[in-house]
Amino acid sequence: MSLTIKEIKEKLSRIETLEELHKHEANNDSRKGVINAIKSREKNILKQQALEEHYLSMNQYENNIMSSNRDALICGIDEVGRGPLAGPVVACAVILEKNHHYIGLDDSKKVSPKNRARLNQNLKENVYQYAYGIASSVEIDELNIYRATQLAMLRAINQLDVTPTHLLIDAMTLDIDIPQTSIIKGDAKSVSIAAASIMAKEYRDQYMRQLSKQFPEYGFDKNAGYGTKQHLKAIDQVGIINEHRQSFEPIKSMMK
Protein backbone atom coordinates (compact mmCIF):
# COMPACT_ATOMS: atom_id res chain seq x y z
CA MET A 1 0.00 0.00 0.00
CA SER A 2 1.44 3.36 -1.04
CA LEU A 3 1.94 6.15 1.44
CA THR A 4 -0.51 9.02 1.59
CA ILE A 5 0.60 12.43 0.36
CA LYS A 6 0.55 13.66 3.96
CA GLU A 7 2.89 10.85 5.01
CA ILE A 8 5.24 11.59 2.12
CA LYS A 9 5.31 15.29 3.02
CA GLU A 10 6.28 14.31 6.56
CA LYS A 11 9.18 12.20 5.27
CA LEU A 12 10.31 14.92 2.88
CA SER A 13 10.35 17.48 5.69
CA ARG A 14 13.22 15.55 7.33
CA ILE A 15 15.44 15.74 4.24
CA GLU A 16 18.20 18.37 4.53
CA THR A 17 20.10 18.15 1.20
CA LEU A 18 19.17 18.32 -2.47
CA GLU A 19 21.16 15.16 -3.15
CA GLU A 20 19.11 13.20 -0.64
CA LEU A 21 15.89 14.71 -1.97
CA HIS A 22 16.67 13.82 -5.59
CA LYS A 23 17.40 10.21 -4.59
CA HIS A 24 14.22 9.80 -2.57
CA GLU A 25 11.73 7.20 -3.79
CA ALA A 26 8.99 9.84 -3.85
CA ASN A 27 10.42 11.03 -7.18
CA ASN A 28 8.87 7.91 -8.74
CA ASP A 29 5.41 8.93 -7.56
CA SER A 30 3.37 10.58 -10.33
CA ARG A 31 0.70 12.06 -8.08
CA LYS A 32 0.46 15.83 -8.47
CA GLY A 33 0.41 16.36 -4.70
CA VAL A 34 3.70 14.46 -4.32
CA ILE A 35 5.33 16.32 -7.22
CA ASN A 36 4.34 19.64 -5.65
CA ALA A 37 5.60 18.47 -2.25
CA ILE A 38 9.01 17.64 -3.75
CA LYS A 39 9.19 21.05 -5.45
CA SER A 40 8.23 22.78 -2.21
CA ARG A 41 10.87 20.89 -0.22
CA GLU A 42 13.50 21.69 -2.86
CA LYS A 43 12.63 25.38 -2.63
CA ASN A 44 12.92 25.30 1.18
CA ILE A 45 16.28 23.51 1.05
CA LEU A 46 17.65 26.08 -1.41
CA LYS A 47 16.39 28.90 0.80
CA GLN A 48 18.07 27.35 3.85
CA GLN A 49 21.32 26.89 1.93
CA ALA A 50 21.24 30.55 0.88
CA LEU A 51 20.76 31.60 4.51
CA GLU A 52 23.67 29.39 5.59
CA GLU A 53 25.94 30.83 2.89
CA HIS A 54 24.95 34.39 3.78
CA TYR A 55 25.61 33.70 7.45
CA LEU A 56 29.07 32.33 6.66
CA SER A 57 29.84 35.39 4.51
CA MET A 58 28.88 37.65 7.41
CA ASN A 59 31.62 36.08 9.55
CA GLN A 60 34.51 37.38 7.44
CA TYR A 61 35.46 40.26 9.73
CA GLU A 62 35.18 38.10 12.84
CA ASN A 63 37.23 35.30 11.23
CA ASN A 64 40.00 37.72 10.24
CA ILE A 65 40.31 38.95 13.82
CA MET A 66 40.12 35.45 15.30
CA SER A 67 42.84 34.20 12.93
CA SER A 68 45.40 36.31 14.81
CA ASN A 69 43.82 36.05 18.27
CA ARG A 70 41.71 33.00 19.07
CA ASP A 71 40.74 34.51 22.43
CA ALA A 72 39.53 37.81 20.99
CA LEU A 73 36.39 39.32 22.49
CA ILE A 74 34.79 40.81 19.40
CA CYS A 75 32.02 43.28 20.11
CA GLY A 76 29.49 44.26 17.46
CA ILE A 77 27.87 47.67 17.92
CA ASP A 78 24.92 49.22 16.14
CA GLU A 79 22.24 51.80 16.80
CA VAL A 80 18.59 52.33 16.02
CA GLY A 81 16.63 55.56 16.04
CA ARG A 82 18.69 58.23 14.32
CA GLY A 83 15.87 59.33 12.03
CA PRO A 84 12.68 59.56 14.15
CA LEU A 85 11.21 62.81 15.44
CA ALA A 86 10.69 61.35 18.91
CA GLY A 87 12.30 58.93 21.31
CA PRO A 88 15.91 58.10 22.13
CA VAL A 89 18.65 56.70 19.96
CA VAL A 90 19.44 53.21 21.25
CA ALA A 91 22.72 51.34 20.80
CA CYS A 92 23.51 47.74 21.58
CA ALA A 93 26.91 46.14 22.15
CA VAL A 94 27.05 42.37 21.62
CA ILE A 95 29.78 39.78 22.11
CA LEU A 96 28.78 36.47 20.54
CA GLU A 97 29.81 33.06 21.80
CA LYS A 98 32.68 31.49 19.84
CA ASN A 99 30.58 28.78 18.14
CA HIS A 100 27.54 30.91 17.38
CA HIS A 101 24.98 29.83 14.79
CA TYR A 102 22.10 32.28 14.29
CA ILE A 103 20.84 31.48 10.81
CA GLY A 104 18.65 34.25 9.43
CA LEU A 105 20.56 36.99 11.21
CA ASP A 106 20.78 40.12 9.07
CA ASP A 107 20.30 43.87 9.12
CA SER A 108 17.22 44.39 11.33
CA LYS A 109 15.51 46.37 8.55
CA LYS A 110 15.59 43.27 6.33
CA VAL A 111 14.17 40.86 8.91
CA SER A 112 10.43 40.40 9.43
CA PRO A 113 9.03 41.44 12.84
CA LYS A 114 8.26 37.80 13.68
CA ASN A 115 11.76 36.56 12.86
CA ARG A 116 13.33 39.60 14.51
CA ALA A 117 11.53 38.83 17.77
CA ARG A 118 12.60 35.17 17.55
CA LEU A 119 16.22 36.08 16.86
CA ASN A 120 16.23 38.69 19.62
CA GLN A 121 15.06 36.15 22.20
CA ASN A 122 17.60 33.62 20.99
CA LEU A 123 20.40 36.17 21.17
CA LYS A 124 19.46 37.37 24.66
CA GLU A 125 19.53 33.80 25.92
CA ASN A 126 22.75 32.68 24.23
CA VAL A 127 25.23 35.48 23.53
CA TYR A 128 28.35 35.84 25.67
CA GLN A 129 27.58 39.44 26.66
CA TYR A 130 25.25 42.23 25.63
CA ALA A 131 24.35 45.69 26.88
CA TYR A 132 22.33 48.70 25.77
CA GLY A 133 23.14 52.39 25.71
CA ILE A 134 20.64 55.22 25.32
CA ALA A 135 20.91 58.89 24.42
CA SER A 136 17.74 60.83 25.14
CA SER A 137 15.94 63.29 22.90
CA VAL A 138 17.27 66.10 25.11
CA GLU A 139 20.84 64.89 24.59
CA ILE A 140 20.19 64.58 20.86
CA ASP A 141 19.09 68.23 20.78
CA GLU A 142 22.08 69.33 22.85
CA LEU A 143 24.78 67.33 21.04
CA ASN A 144 23.36 66.62 17.55
CA ILE A 145 22.30 63.16 16.42
CA TYR A 146 25.76 61.98 15.34
CA ARG A 147 27.44 62.76 18.66
CA ALA A 148 24.44 61.47 20.60
CA THR A 149 24.72 58.19 18.69
CA GLN A 150 28.39 57.94 19.62
CA LEU A 151 27.43 58.60 23.25
CA ALA A 152 24.83 55.82 23.20
CA MET A 153 27.38 53.40 21.73
CA LEU A 154 29.99 54.28 24.35
CA ARG A 155 27.42 53.80 27.10
CA ALA A 156 26.55 50.37 25.74
CA ILE A 157 30.22 49.32 25.71
CA ASN A 158 30.74 50.62 29.25
CA GLN A 159 27.74 48.61 30.47
CA LEU A 160 29.40 45.33 29.47
CA ASP A 161 30.86 43.22 32.27
CA VAL A 162 34.00 42.57 30.20
CA THR A 163 36.22 44.77 28.04
CA PRO A 164 36.15 43.83 24.36
CA THR A 165 39.45 43.38 22.53
CA HIS A 166 38.05 44.60 19.20
CA LEU A 167 35.01 46.62 18.17
CA LEU A 168 33.09 46.16 14.93
CA ILE A 169 30.97 49.28 14.45
CA ASP A 170 28.37 50.14 11.86
CA ALA A 171 29.71 53.14 9.93
CA MET A 172 31.09 55.08 12.89
CA THR A 173 34.29 55.54 14.90
CA LEU A 174 34.40 55.97 18.66
CA ASP A 175 36.74 57.86 20.98
CA ILE A 176 37.73 54.83 23.05
CA ASP A 177 41.03 53.03 23.58
CA ILE A 178 39.98 49.75 21.97
CA PRO A 179 40.95 48.59 18.46
CA GLN A 180 37.99 49.13 16.17
CA THR A 181 36.81 48.59 12.62
CA SER A 182 34.16 50.83 11.10
CA ILE A 183 32.14 49.01 8.43
CA ILE A 184 29.81 50.76 5.99
CA LYS A 185 26.50 48.86 5.99
CA GLY A 186 28.05 46.72 8.70
CA ASP A 187 24.70 45.33 9.83
CA ALA A 188 24.53 43.44 6.52
CA LYS A 189 28.22 42.41 6.48
CA SER A 190 29.08 41.41 10.05
CA VAL A 191 27.20 38.88 12.14
CA SER A 192 28.20 40.72 15.33
CA ILE A 193 26.86 44.05 14.10
CA ALA A 194 23.71 42.38 12.76
CA ALA A 195 23.08 40.90 16.21
CA ALA A 196 23.45 44.37 17.74
CA SER A 197 21.10 45.78 15.10
CA ILE A 198 18.39 43.22 15.91
CA MET A 199 18.67 43.70 19.68
CA ALA A 200 18.76 47.50 19.51
CA LYS A 201 15.72 47.54 17.22
CA GLU A 202 13.68 45.28 19.50
CA TYR A 203 14.67 47.27 22.60
CA ARG A 204 13.74 50.62 21.07
CA ASP A 205 10.48 49.37 19.58
CA GLN A 206 9.45 48.09 23.01
CA TYR A 207 10.38 51.45 24.54
CA MET A 208 8.20 53.26 22.00
CA ARG A 209 5.29 50.86 22.57
CA GLN A 210 5.43 51.65 26.28
CA LEU A 211 5.60 55.36 25.52
CA SER A 212 2.52 54.99 23.32
CA LYS A 213 0.53 53.81 26.34
CA GLN A 214 1.20 57.18 27.98
CA PHE A 215 0.71 59.23 24.82
CA PRO A 216 -1.54 57.21 22.47
CA GLU A 217 -2.39 60.16 20.24
CA TYR A 218 1.06 60.08 18.57
CA GLY A 219 0.86 56.44 17.46
CA PHE A 220 4.36 55.59 18.70
CA ASP A 221 3.47 51.89 18.83
CA LYS A 222 3.10 51.92 15.04
CA ASN A 223 5.48 54.66 13.84
CA ALA A 224 8.30 54.26 16.42
CA GLY A 225 8.58 58.06 16.50
CA TYR A 226 8.94 58.61 12.76
CA GLY A 227 7.10 61.51 11.13
CA THR A 228 4.00 59.77 9.82
CA LYS A 229 0.86 61.68 8.89
CA GLN A 230 -0.81 60.66 12.17
CA HIS A 231 2.22 61.71 14.20
CA LEU A 232 2.54 65.12 12.54
CA LYS A 233 -1.19 65.73 12.90
CA ALA A 234 -1.01 64.97 16.63
CA ILE A 235 1.93 67.36 17.06
CA ASP A 236 -0.06 70.07 15.28
CA GLN A 237 -3.14 69.45 17.44
CA VAL A 238 -1.75 68.75 20.93
CA GLY A 239 1.86 69.89 20.72
CA ILE A 240 5.03 68.04 21.67
CA ILE A 241 6.28 66.12 24.70
CA ASN A 242 9.76 65.81 26.23
CA GLU A 243 10.48 62.81 24.00
CA HIS A 244 10.26 64.96 20.87
CA ARG A 245 13.47 66.20 19.26
CA GLN A 246 13.11 69.96 18.99
CA SER A 247 16.19 70.28 16.77
CA PHE A 248 14.57 68.08 14.10
CA GLU A 249 12.42 69.38 11.27
CA PRO A 250 9.52 69.94 10.98
CA ILE A 251 9.29 70.25 14.78
CA LYS A 252 11.96 72.96 14.83
CA SER A 253 9.94 75.15 12.44
CA MET A 254 6.66 74.37 14.19
CA MET A 255 8.11 75.62 17.49
CA LYS A 256 8.91 79.09 16.13
UniProtKB/Swiss-Prot annotation:
A GO BP term here is: DNA replication, removal of RNA primer
Main localization of the protein described in the UniProt heading: cytoplasm
At the top level, the lineage of the source is Bacteria
Q: Does the keyword Nuclease apply?
A: yes
* Record SUPFAM superfamilies: Ribonuclease H-like (SSF53098)
A Pfam family this chain is assigned to: RNase_HII
The GO terms describing molecular function are: manganese ion binding; RNA binding; RNA-DNA hybrid ribonuclease activity
Location in the cell: Cytoplasm
Q: Tell me which EC number(s) this protein carries.
A: 3.1.26.4
What is its cofactor?
Mn(2+); Mg(2+)
Signal sequence region: none
* Cofactor: binding comment: Manganese or magnesium. Binds 1 divalent metal ion per monomer in the absence of substrate. May bind a second metal ion after substrate binding.
Q: Provide the binding site for a divalent metal cation.
A: 78-79, 170
Q: Where is the RNase H type-2 domain?
A: 72-256
Q: Which GO terms describe its cellular component?
A: cytoplasm; ribonuclease H2 complex
Q: Which UniProt keywords apply?
A: Cytoplasm, Endonuclease, Hydrolase, Manganese, Metal-binding, Nuclease
Reactions catalysed, semicolon-separated, are: Endonucleolytic cleavage to 5'-phosphomonoester
PANTHER family cross-referenced by the UniProt entry: RIBONUCLEASE H2 SUBUNIT A, RIBONUCLEASE HII
The family annotation for this protein states:
Belongs to the RNase HII family.
General function of this protein? Endonuclease that specifically degrades the RNA of RNA-DNA hybrids.
Q: What is this protein called?
A: Ribonuclease HII
